[in-house]
Amino acid sequence: MRFTVTSRGDDVSNTLQQKIKRYLLDFGLTLDEQEPDIVITVGGDGTLLHAFHRYTSRLEDTAFVGIHTGHLGFYADWVPDEVEKLVIHIAKTPYQIVEYPLLEVVVRHTDESESKRLLALNECTVKSQEGSLVSNVEIKGDVFEVFRGDGLCISTPSGSTAYNKALGGAILHPSLASIQISEMASINNRVYRTIGSPLVLPQHHTCLIKPLNQVELQVTIDHFTLAYKRVKSIQCRVAEEKIRFARFRPFPFWKRVKESFIGDS
């Protein structure tokens, strides 16, 4: 089996990274940073997000497992004290694959130049660089509303616990192949109206955001921030690809949510 280990970059994570490499090499596994079968991330959710974006071209062939040394390890199943146990599992135990849905984002330009396709594990946000975002929001080809406000957040089920949750969105189980649209400070008065509620779209529904004024847009894809001019539309839907996690023991989603946000009662 080919593996690689990525680190958050702090001393604790770097030490664990080197320790895991030594252990797995001693077990006869092959270190391969280009085409790994399994990616072990040491840090927090940000470390796993970086690893995901590095290996998006290998999602069908690569599984991820996280060790939590950060402040929030929603995607991490293991803690530093369990490193030796995890290494033995990786070297000797067949693992279960658990798949989570991803978000596909396609940015198209008014000059009909080549479109840009992106994948997000957590969310995509769309904002105007100059004041409020004013755009048509289409669902399945029909105009649903004219949105006016700070911006829109489109999240995956696993990403529903991140920025989406802070916006008052619902937490969705990753077994639901869906995306969620949440508003950022929408303008609602006698003249302008939006739905004012998060929307959950199933796998076969597409959301199309069409700016009504030609301003520069700020688009975030997870931890990346991009600037686009002359945007014709931003299309969001459930991606065909999925992220694959290597599971060596049960870790129920709702238990993960409770431990991340509520703690022990």
UniProtKB/Swiss-Prot annotation:
NAD(+) binds at residues 45-46, 50, 122-123, 148, 150, 185. Its cofactor is a divalent metal cation. Keywords: ATP-binding, Cytoplasm, Kinase, NAD, NADP, Nucleotide-binding, Transferase. The active site is at residue 45. It comes from the Bacteria. It catalyses: NAD(+) + ATP = ADP + NADP(+) + H(+). It is found in: Cytoplasm. GO terms for molecular function: ATP binding; metal ion binding; NAD binding; NAD+ kinase activity. Pfam families: NAD_kinase (PF01513), NAD_kinase_C (PF20143). The keyword Repeat does not apply. The keyword Oxidoreductase does not apply. GO terms for biological process: NAD metabolic process; NADP biosynthetic process. GO terms for cellular component: cytoplasm. It is an enzyme of class 2 (transferase). InterPro entries: ATP-NAD_kinase_N (IPR017438), ATP-NAD_kinase_PpnK-typ_C (IPR017437), NAD/diacylglycerol_kinase_sf (IPR016064), NADK (IPR002504). Involved in the regulation of the intracellular balance of NAD and NADP, and is a key enzyme in the biosynthesis of NADP. Catalyzes specifically the phosphorylation on 2'-hydroxyl of the adenosine moiety of NAD to yield NADP. Belongs to the NAD kinase family. This is NAD kinase 1. The lineage of its organism: Bacteria, Bacillati, Bacillota, Bacilli, Bacillales. The gene is nadK1.
